[in-house]
Structure formats: C-alpha cells, structure tokens
From Swiss-Prot:
GO terms for biological process: homoserine metabolic process; methionine biosynthetic process. It holds the Pfam family Abhydrolase_1. It is an enzyme of class 2 (transferase). The record marks 323 as: Important for acyl-CoA specificity. This is Homoserine O-succinyltransferase. Belongs to the AB hydrolase superfamily. MetX family. Residues 45-360 form the AB hydrolase-1 domain. Homodimer. The gene is metXS. GO terms for molecular function: homoserine O-acetyltransferase activity; homoserine O-succinyltransferase activity. The active site is at residues 151, 321, 354. Gene3D superfamilies: 1.10.1740.110, alpha/beta hydrolase. Transfers a succinyl group from succinyl-CoA to L-homoserine, forming succinyl-L-homoserine. The lineage of its organism: Bacteria, Pseudomonadati, Pseudomonadota, Betaproteobacteria, Burkholderiales.
Length: 381
C-alpha cells in the first residue's frame, strides 16, 4: 500500500474565547491541523483522528523537508489502508497545551509578552473536544462519519460521543479506558515528580533560563515507556542480554553504567523524548489523563453516563496491554450494552502491550478496515 506522500500542516486561528473546564478562558488561540483525502460534497465522509500523549496532528505522510518524519499512524491512514484516504477525509488536530504548534505553554502569553510556561491553564479531554468541534465547524462538518483514537485518543473519541452525540456517527475507541486506575495515576505522578524535581525546571519558567529539564523528562519517558510494553515483549526484545557484543556472563562492569540492553534502550528513548518534547506539556497532558472520568458526574455509574449517546461503537483492546487492560474496554462495552447501543468489541491477541495500537498487526488492521467498509457504505464513500 502506498503512502499518502508529502503533507503539510496548517494553522487555524480562533478569536472566540474558549472557556475551559477549570473556569479559565483562552482567547485568540490557534490549533495546528493536517488533513488527508477529500471532503465530499455532502461533507459526510469526515473522520477525526485524535492523538495520544506524545503524538500530534501529524497522523500520516511525510514532510517535504524531512523524509524520516513519518506520521505516527501512517500504517493505519492512507490510500488503501484501513482508514482509506481515497474514501474518507481525515483530520488530525494538535491539542491545546501541546508543543507542536497549537497554543500551549511554549506560546507567547499576550498579557506578558513571554511564554506561558506554568501559567498555561490546565486543560482536560473535554476541553480538547470542544476545541476540536470548532475545527469541525470551520470545515462545515456537522457530523463526523467517525471519531477515532487509541489510548488517550480513544478517551477523546468516547468524550466526543458524550459531548456531541448528534455529531458522531461512529466512535472507534482502541486500547483505551473510561478512567485511569489508581495505579495509572500513580505512574503519572511519579513521572511528573521527576520533572518537577529537576533543578532545571525553574517552576515551569525554564524557557527564560535557556535550559530544559532534560533529566526529569528522560526519567518520565522511561517510566511511561515501560508501561507501554508487555513483559513478554520486553523479554523477547531484550531478555537479560548485556550491552557487550559477546554477551559473556562474566562481562559485568561492576558499576552503575549501562549494563543491560534494556537499560540502553530506555535511556535512548528518554534522550530522544527530551530532545523534542516539552516538560510543561507533559505535565498538562498527564493531568488531563488523570481527570478524565465521564462517570464521575453520575456517581461513578458509566452506564448512566453513556445513556444519551447515539453513536455506533467499535471498541478494541489487546491481550497484553496492562496499562489500559482489556477489562477497561469491557467496562465501556458493558455500559453501552446496558443502554442497548450498537457496539462491536474485539480483544486482539497481540504480544506488544499498550503500544500494539500503533503497530501493523494484520488481525487488528483487518478489523478496522472491515469496520470502515461498513461506514463507507453508510456515507456513500
């Protein structure tokens, strides 16, 4: 299957203030967007793809100035791919608070003329959805054929079906959860603590000091990355292999430098992440994850929370995902069935843990492809 090829983002400016769930108000904000495919005359073939923690609007394709800049879901979105851009008009939106061009902590605060830094207001999944709805309005899209996402993106897809039930025909929720467990909140807290305790954090105003809390970001990413992989996958990739080429059991250095391949891998992932991601953004997005809990307003009753939804659903989980385990997806399915909603559920046997939603797995992709075939028939795409 061919790639979608060279793509380019564009920036959308919004003058109407956006009131956030916290009560703060953002005015004159911008969102970076990428689109793929063509919007049909009826504007009925639009699909919104929502991104996870460290991703962005760049869902598919490559940038002309960097042939290595492949979109984060390029194996899923493109001509002839499960989400076929020959049939659907796909939108990727970089969320508020991110560090890839949309208004966030790195943006200039018009009140001070300096970056917002830690002054940028806390945002929630619901805030992102309301901002995305304004993007849809700008395109003249009254109803999405589907809203789709994995992990945190799946939470946004679910929130869309709750907040805008008339505007979502299908919700595709992959490797997600209706709320974070105490363990997941704990992982996020440890990661945030690594950043907050970095001497280069400077209370979030490190931009003015010309530094970056790299050490904290590195540790935060290492913690997170462990939770994205399964134990079996890590055993297969690394086992107890030493970094030394001969792998000799007597090749220990007897110090605290890197000894094992898995240590080297985690440090590499941490360094790479610290190069391109922003610490304040990491704090914001992990807190948005913590706060997401649509059942909270219904005394913890998810069935009651989903009672007014109107979309049809595809919910998928992966057997070795322990970050957002299949049981969490089954909670969503049960709540939908309690309300007699149309829902398809698949629990995919895959060894790759939470990150499986990003990988090219034939069973997984065939499932998504078949579901989009159904949507295409409905909208005449």
């Amino acid at each position: 299957m061919e790639s979608i090829g060279v793509v380019a983002p564009h920036t959308m400016h919004f003058a109407e203030p956006l009131r956030l769930q916290s009560g703060s108000v953002l005015g004159n904000y911008q969102l970076v967007v990428e689109t793929y495919g063509e919007l049909n005359a009826a504007r009925s073939n639009a699909v919104l793809v929502c991104h996870a923690l460290n991703a962005s609007h760049h869902v598919a394709g490559v940038y002309a100035d960097d042939p290595r800049s492949t979109g984060w879901w390029d194996n899923m979105v493109g001509p002839g791919k499960p989400l076929d851009t020959n049939r659907f008009f796909v939108i990727g939106v970089n969320n508020l608070g991110s560090c890839f061009g949309s208004t966030g902590p790195m943006s200039i605060d018009p009140a001070t003329g300096t970056p917002y830094g830690a002054r940028f207001p806390v945002v929630t999944v619901e805030d992102w959805v309301h901002a995305q709805a304004r993007v849809a309005d700008a395109f003249g899209i009254e109803r999405f054929a589907a809203v789709m996402g994995g992990s945190l993106g799946g939470m946004q897809a679910l929130a869309w079906s709750l907040l805008y039930p008339e505007r979502v025909a299908h919700c595709i929720d992959i490797a997600s959860t209706p709320k974070l467990s105490a363990q997941n909140i704990a992982f996020n807290e440890v990661a945030r603590s690594a950043i907050l305790s970095d001497p280069d954090f400077h209370g979030g105003d490190y931009y003015a000091h010309g530094v970056k809390p790299r050490r904290g970001l590195r540790v935060a990413r290492m913690i997170g990355h462990i939770t994205y992989l399964s134990d079996d996958d890590m055993a297969e990739k690394f086992g107890r292999a030493l970094r030394r080429a001969d792998g000799a059991l007597d090749a220990y250095n007897f110090n605290f430098d890197v000894e094992f391949e898995v240590e080297s891998y985690l440090r590499y992932q941490g360094d790479k992440f610290a190069d391109y991601f922003d610490a304040n953004t990491y704090l914001l997005i992990t807190r948005a994850l913590d706060y997401f809990d649509p059942a909270k307003a219904f005394n913890g009753n998810l069935s009651a929370a989903l009672a007014h939804t109107k979309a049809k659903y595809l919910v998928a989980s992966f057997t070795t995902d322990w970050r957002f385990a299949p049981a969490r997806s089954r909670e969503i399915v049960k709540a939908l069935l309690d309300n007699r909603r149309s829902v398809s559920y698949a629990e995919i046997d895959a060894p790759h843990g939470h990150d499986a939603f990003l990988l090219d797995d034939a069973r997984y992709h065939n499932l998504v492809r078949a579901y989009y075939e159904r949507i295409a028939e409905e909208v005449g795409a």
